[in-house]
């Protein structure tokens, strides 16, 4: 996350991300020990194990920073309990440009909070589509602009609270 933004998370998602952060922080000494062990193997220019351990450390530190920023700027709340209104944490079904036969179902949430099994697409409330749907009621049509500049009409068919 490059710019600071508030992210809505359920308590369950917050706890899951916090546990991941705690595990990554606890794993720091393990990676540091592996780097030291690989460093002792000799010439660092040709030491693949050393470079792999350093790469792993870099990826882990990047994820730690990402999780810290996310959790520091998270708004923790309950998933919506209200049906019929598109809110962060809602599973919505929509159709585009008046084509009622072509529907799409997705979760309005952040990628970090999103569906673990990958069976449901996730659109951020701050994305053009997600933002257009926030607070829309079933049957309401809204418009949003896609990256190529085209305006798209989207109609909310249903909105239900997401349950993990």
UniProtKB/Swiss-Prot annotation:
Keywords: Coiled coil, DNA-binding, Transcription, Transcription regulation. The gene is greA. Belongs to the GreA/GreB family. Necessary for efficient RNA polymerase transcription elongation past template-encoded arresting sites. The arresting sites in DNA have the property of trapping a certain fraction of elongating RNA polymerases that pass through, resulting in locked ternary complexes. Cleavage of the nascent transcript by cleavage factors such as GreA or GreB allows the resumption of elongation from the new 3'terminus. GreA releases sequences of 2 to 3 nucleotides. It comes from Mycobacteroides abscessus (strain ATCC 19977 / DSM 44196 / CCUG 20993 / CIP 104536 / JCM 13569 / NCTC 13031 / TMC 1543 / L948) (Mycobacterium abscessus). This is Transcription elongation factor GreA. GO terms for molecular function: DNA binding; RNA polymerase binding. The keyword Secreted does not apply. Gene3D superfamilies: Transcription elongation factor, GreA/GreB, C-terminal domain, Transcription elongation factor, GreA/GreB, N-terminal domain. Transmembrane segments: none annotated. GO terms for biological process: DNA-templated transcription elongation; regulation of DNA-templated transcription elongation. Residues 50-76 form a coiled coil.
